[in-house]
């Protein structure tokens, strides 16, 4: 899984002002992100969950392919308020964004999701936290749908059972328990759940 520090630019090639004022971390150019040797660091058969802003969808596809993966589907994160309504505090030139995307790609043979993934809806609804921080619900979803080992690039905190790479990964201790009290992924009700041990 990766959440790159995307650089937003307007049509003049400069950083868009609505993103510049919110920028609280260093960014990378598209070329630099594409050049990361991800293909050398992952297994021959692997899944990629790549976070990408709505405005940079095409750039996200380019990165996914540059890292040696083929796009298959996506997951949508819907940012909501405490009352469950859409959180309209996001930025956007054409629309006020209340969603972000995870592009799902695969590489290698027999790379289908595990059995739980075939009943997992591609939708997460949760409240926003710190700037650019993604929802905790992604972790159990990925762990249920994809075989390990698990790697998080551009990580902002440690995660049990994961290898984390990121300049903030040693500086933050997530409060998983408290966050779980007010945020949950959206799943369709089911009378029977597939076993997490099932093979793809």
Language-model segments: what does each one mean?
Residues 1-200:
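Class I S-adenosyl-L-methionine-dependent methyltransferase catalytic core
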């Amino acid at each position: 899984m990766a959440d790159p520090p995307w650089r937003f630019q307007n049509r003049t090639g400069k950083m868009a002002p609505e993103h510049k004022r919110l920028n609280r971390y260093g960014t990378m150019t598209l070329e630099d992100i594409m050049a990361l040797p991800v293909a050398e660091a992952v297994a021959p058969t692997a899944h990629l969950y790549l976070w990408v802003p709505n405005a940079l969808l095409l750039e996200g596809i380019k990165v996914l392919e540059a890292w040696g993966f083929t796009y298959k589907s996506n997951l949508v994160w819907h940012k909501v308020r405490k009352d469950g309504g859409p959180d309209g505090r996001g930025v956007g030139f054409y629309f006020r964004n209340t969603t972000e995307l995870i592009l799902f790609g695969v590489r290698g043979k027999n790379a289908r999701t595990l059995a739980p993934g075939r009943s997992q809806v591609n939708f997460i609804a949760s409240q926003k936290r710190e700037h650019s921080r993604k929802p905790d619900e992604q972790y159990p979803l990925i762990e249920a749908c994809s075989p390990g080992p698990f790697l998080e690039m551009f990580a902002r905190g440690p995660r049990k059972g994961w290898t984390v790479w990121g300049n903030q990964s040693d500086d933050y201790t997530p409060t998983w328990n408290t966050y779980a009290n007010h945020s949950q992924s959206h799943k369709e009700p089911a009378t029977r759940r597939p076993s997490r041990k099932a093979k793809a």
